[in-house]
A protein has these predicted regions:
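Beta-propeller domains with acidic blade repeats across secreted/periplasmic ectodomains
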Residues: 1-122, 143
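Amphipathic, well-packed alpha-helical segments that form the structural scaffold of globular domains
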Residues: 7-10, 36, 153, 172, ...
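Short, solvent-exposed turn/loop segments enriched in Gly/Ser/Thr/Pro and often Arg
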Residues: 27-31, 160, 190
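Short alpha-helical
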Residues: 33, 147, 192
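Amphipathic alpha-helical scaffolding segments comprising HEAT/armadillo-like alpha-solenoid repeats
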Residues: 116-124, 145-157, 175-187
Length: 192
């Protein structure tokens, strides 16, 4: 990042933001005061990336430090600042001197009201854009073990590669079924 100072990083798994960000890495860089996405495309045996700025400011106190995706697909950016970046002379250890902001990124014109009234199942949580929700779903499905095989099998046969990988991870943990699912994964048509 040149003179940058990379901090928070996450993969955007939502579909609320424009297509260019979907499935791509997001990264905070406090030095140049920017949150970027790094869309990648396949290139031979590897990948080629580009840089797309998501949130940038000339405000000298803007220091994006972390990024995450909310359950609705919006993105939260933590902007935390201390008196001397890097913590050499921290002046934000006392209430009243602490400084920071949280930004929520959503597309213009989209309803930004979030509701939790939607019924969430462990399986739907496993496909959530939010990492904490995915982990809760993973824990619940892992706990029931073999009873979740049928449900996880449907996700494993789906088209979305990330939920497929999560389903495979759980299926391969079921005692007695490890070889079945690892063998199926090795024969899978997706090279990734």
């Amino acid at each position: 990042t040149g003179q940058g100072s990379p901090t928070g990083i996450a993969i955007y798994e939502g579909d609320l933001l424009p297509k260019v960000f979907q499935g791509q890495m997001m990264h905070c860089d406090a030095g140049p005061r920017v949150v970027r996405a790094y869309p990648v495309t396949k290139s031979g045996a590897g990948y080629k990336g580009e840089i797309v700025n998501m949130l940038q400011s000339k405000d000298p106190w803007y220091r994006p430090s972390d990024v995450c995706t909310a359950p609705d697909g919006s993105v939260f950016v933590a902007d935390w600042h201390d008196g001397h970046v890097g913590g050499h002379h921290m002046t934000d250890h006392k209430p009243g001197q602490m400084t920071g902001r949280i930004y929520r990124l959503t597309p213009k014109g989209k309803n930004t009201q979030y509701t939790i009234s939607k019924k969430r199942t462990a399986l739907s949580m496993l496909s959530s854009p939010n990492m904490a929700a995915r982990y809760i779903g993973w824990q619940q499905l892992n706990k029931v073990g073999a009873k979740a095989e049928s449900t996880l099998g449907k996700l494993w046969k789906g088209d979305d590669q990330r939920p497929r990988a999560r389903a495979l991870h759980l299926l391969a943990r079921i005692k007695g079924l490890e070889k079945k699912y690892i063998g199926a994964a090795l024969k899978d048509a997706n090279p990734d």
